[in-house]
Amino acid sequence: MKKHLLFLGAPGAGKGTQAELLSQTTSYLHLSTGELLRKEIEMNTNLGIQVKDIMNRGELVSDELVLKIVRQNLVKDNIGWILDGYPRNLSQADSLNEVLSEINQPLEVVFYLDIPEEVLIERLLLRGRKDDTEETIRTRVDIYKKTTEPLIQYFKDLSLLEYINADRDLKTISSDIKQKMA
């Protein structure tokens, strides 16, 4: 069974949900970059202090800093891991592959959670978050298309990509993912 996994998909496609479900049934480490950054800040580590300072200025955390945090968590692996929310662009994907090669934990499969845009927008609006207006959601989807969608071809070229129809119920999606891990 594959044990070094990545979930890719638009905001609201269900990456975090599916990664967490899989983590619970496999004991694989679920590495969400957002949660990793928050954890570093909460623990007041040197990296966390840098991240907090950057975020307080309203800036994006650099690729290098995110990669450092991801790397230190991957090194802890002894069972398996699931990456969610990283990489977000081709540069990050190249850097991640270099790190995974260095620590001898190559990526084994990338699950692309594919979902129609209108279903995605409806799903995000139903979440009821204050910042989830139709306008902000469409902006996030547009940014995703420009920066993250090229990763689909990147991982397809590496023969790592598995398409998952994310416009179904949680159990069916989860079952599909587990079958493709075998």
Curated annotation (Swiss-Prot):
Asked if the keyword Cytoplasm belongs to this entry, the reply reads yes
One term of GO molecular function: ATP binding
Key words, A-Z: ATP-binding, Cytoplasm, Kinase, Nucleotide biosynthesis, Nucleotide-binding, Transferase
Q: Which Pfam families match?
A: ADK
* Gene3D superfamilies with a match to the protein in the record: P-loop containing nucleotide triphosphate hydrolases
Q: Where are the transmembrane segments?
A: none
Query: Domain of life here?
Result: Bacteria
Signal peptide coordinates: none
| SUPFAM superfamilies in the record | P-loop containing nucleoside triphosphate hydrolases (SSF52540)
Q: At which positions is ATP bound?
A: 12-17, 127, 168
**Protein residues bound to AMP:** 33, 38, 59-61, 85-88, 92, 129, 140
Catalytic activity line of the entry: AMP + ATP = 2 ADP
- Please state the pathway this protein functions in, per its UniProt record: Purine metabolism; AMP biosynthesis via salvage pathway; AMP from ADP: step 1/1
> Could you tell me the Gene Ontology terms of the biological process aspect for this record?
AMP salvage
Q: What is known of its domains?
A: Consists of three domains, a large central CORE domain and two small peripheral domains, NMPbind and LID, which undergo movements during catalysis. The LID domain closes over the site of phosphoryl transfer upon ATP binding. Assembling and dissambling the active center during each catalytic cycle provides an effective means to prevent ATP hydrolysis.
Q: What does this protein do?
A: Catalyzes the reversible transfer of the terminal phosphate group between ATP and AMP. Plays an important role in cellular energy homeostasis and in adenine nucleotide metabolism.
- Name-wise, this protein is Adenylate kinase
Q: Which species is the source of this protein?
A: Prochlorococcus marinus (strain AS9601)
